[in-house]
Amino acid sequence: MGQKINPLGFRLGTTQGHHSIWFAQAKNYSDGLQEDQKIRNCIKNYLQKNMRISSGVEGIARIEIRKRIDLIQVIIYMGFPKLLLEGKTRRIEELQMNVQKELNCVNRKLNIAITRITNPYGHPNILAEFIAGQLKNRVSFRKAIKKAIELTEQADTKGIQVQIAGRLDGKEIARVEWMREGRVPLQTIRAKIDYCSYGVRTVYGVLGIKIWIFWE
């Protein structure tokens, strides 16, 4: 059987970098990981509650966390930063307070920055959110995939592969469907490939979306 490795972990140190940048002693390492997970969940939950928009896309490409002894710096890479910057200072301060409350950090300062990314639909996380929104609105999965592929073509990507698994279009038996456009060389380590795995709850059950995007 084919052994399927995560494309991001496979390329760490060549074309991919870490999303958490800090050091810790072995006994404190698990606490640091849990802290990172809390920060990411808190930011995503805040966006879901406060940024209701028609497309259902939060627009977070990735959240980078850098830690020093007295400072936690969080950089949110967003495709649509207007969602968070409309009431710029108030919203960011509110988000900062929510994260601080969740972490209960007394001795460390928290700093949240937002960076806008170009070509948002060239990032698999944002594209997966778009497809999930379409599936929740009961759009046919084939139509949703084709629309997503059209959006990535505008972002100058060299190839994309989209896979959806589950009870597609409400059918009784779960199955896996996929579509590829262009080249996606998963075996080539130096190929810059972005990957995302995303679960979406629909009226028929949970569907799993996987997206591979080949840049260069």
UniProtKB/Swiss-Prot annotation:
Q: What is its main location?
A: plastid
Q: Which residue ranges does the record assign to the KH type-2 domain?
A: 43-118
**Can you cite an annotated GO cellular component?**
chloroplast
Family annotation (Pfam families): Ribosomal_S3_C
Q: How does it assemble?
A: Part of the 30S ribosomal subunit.
Supply the PANTHER family for this chain.
30S/40S RIBOSOMAL PROTEIN S3, SMALL RIBOSOMAL SUBUNIT PROTEIN US3C
Q: What is this protein called?
A: Small ribosomal subunit protein uS3c
The encoding gene is rps3
